[in-house]
Amino acid sequence: MAAKNIKYNEDARKKIHKGVKTLAEAVKVTLGPKGRHVVIDKSFGSPQVTKDGVTVAKEIELEDKHENMGAQMVKEVASKTADKAGDGTTTATVLAEAIYSEGLRNVTAGANPMDLKRGIDKAVKVVVDEIKKISKPVQHHKEIAQVATISANNDAEIGNLIAEAMEKVGKNGSITVEEAKGFETVLDVVEGMNFNRGYLSSYFSTNPETQECVLEEALVLIYDKKISGIKDFLPVLQQVAESGRPLLIIAEDIEGEALATLVVNRLRAGFRVCAVKAPGFGDRRKAMLEDIAILTGGQLISEELGMKLENTTLAMLGKAKKVIVSKEDTTIVEGLGSKEDIESRCESIKKQIEDSTSDYDKEKLQERLAKLSGGVAVIRVGAATEIEMKEKKDRVDDAQHATLAAVEEGILPGGGTALVRCIPTLEAFIPILTNEDEQIGARIVLKALSAPLKQIAANAGKEGAIICQQVLSRSSSEGYDALRDAYTDMIEAGILDPTKVTRCALESAASVAGLLLTTEALIADIPEEKSSSAPAMPGAGMDY
């Protein structure tokens, strides 16, 4: 085991503070509409230009191991806020630094760190309750666009695209962000259930120009095993042919004699049919097939459930208004399943998302929920250069997450105004605390609440303390619009923050800052000294 370098008490706290301050200084310059960009060197490719707090934080590693511990803890604040709310990482970093710096001053002056932490936690609870009271639910398309615009650094084009996407796919729908091949940023919406499996033979296509197979008023056969022979498959095919309706077959695979029979019937008899492989793998495949069955009002033909392909009847098949199958994917539009069954399935998936501990599983469950309930929107981000595209893509990601957070918990006056509006409530609460150090802890939070507003003002070239006083003297929804350098009604001006983002930023910042304040020792490996001399050449020093 490597030898350790241990720092105690004042030395430890100074090192942590230096690390926290170093990271916060790099991150907080990005805050607000007049925040600056940060350029990050990459080991390969061109440098990355960003205004996203968590992207800046993730790139920072300090040489001094003890200082790096402080920086990594604040990086955790940004990451946790990004994971929970998807935005607000810079606000969280500013709050964490403000709480820790003020707390450290009091610990150095002799305050009990444990009592300070208790006071901080109690104050945060009071502020969160007040934030929830101030919060307003999102009701209009316009408000969604405003939240997205603010989060995308006042880019109205991005704001409107995200609002349009949200309107089309609903709050359970999925919005994905991809890089476009051109200069334009565009929105594509896929209605209905879409999965990335195309037709098994190009002979199934009905449109030679688009190479797509379009089936109107289609029946859907859903089977969880391979179909290779024709014997078991023939009875259901005959029933469908007699009904005169087109057929989509979804199975683990369709090969050999079965596939050849379908192709021949398609070409010679004009039987409108298309075969695709089932989406997903393993247990996820079975779940997705069940989703398709519920969406189309059919049954999953599974031998595990005691069903056989040869006994399948028309009543067991799903139905859809339209099916579009291309070389790469399949879209089922307006499945005719029962609304109650679909809602029940959606609730079941939501419960699984809540219970899941794996980010990957949550993402896949969210995809399934989107496909069942709303649809999928894809925002393709275009720009003149790759650097600009990546920076823009970061802003679209932020705006998308902020919008989802706003729909979930509501909106607040933006620009740091909501936190400042909680100051009078917290001031009234502090005298109720009986422990003097707990009161000091609550006052630390009281002072930190104005830090984001002061930083936004500082980035706009103004004196933060004066701006803060002006905001406090005005009515509840009025705040400072840094972009236009004016005091205005933030709700009317469309300068909004999602409640969830503000709440998560404060909770994450207070949690980590409280832990750092109660730290008394730091343990780090002593770096091994590297030998400066070059290794000896083979055979050196030998006399031949």
Curated annotation (Swiss-Prot):
It is found in: Cytoplasm. The keyword Lipoprotein does not apply. Keywords: ATP-binding, Chaperone, Cytoplasm, Isomerase, Nucleotide-binding, Stress response. PROSITE patterns: CHAPERONINS_CPN60. The keyword Cytoplasm applies. It is an enzyme of class 5 (isomerase). Its main location: cytoplasm. One of its GO terms (biological process) is protein refolding. Pfam families: Cpn60_TCP1. Induction: By stress. ATP binds at residues 30-33, 51, 87-91, 415, 481-483, 497. Its EC number is 5.6.1.7. Coiled coil: none annotated. It catalyses: ATP + H2O + a folded polypeptide = ADP + phosphate + an unfolded polypeptide. One of its GO terms (cellular component) is cytoplasm. One of its GO terms (molecular function) is ATP-dependent protein folding chaperone. Forms a cylinder of 14 subunits composed of two heptameric rings stacked back-to-back. Interacts with the co-chaperonin GroES. Belongs to the chaperonin (HSP60) family. Together with its co-chaperonin GroES, plays an essential role in assisting protein folding. The GroEL-GroES system forms a nano-cage that allows encapsulation of the non-native substrate proteins and provides a physical environment optimized to promote and accelerate protein folding. This is Chaperonin GroEL 1. It comes from Chlamydia caviae (strain ATCC VR-813 / DSM 19441 / 03DC25 / GPIC) (Chlamydophila caviae).
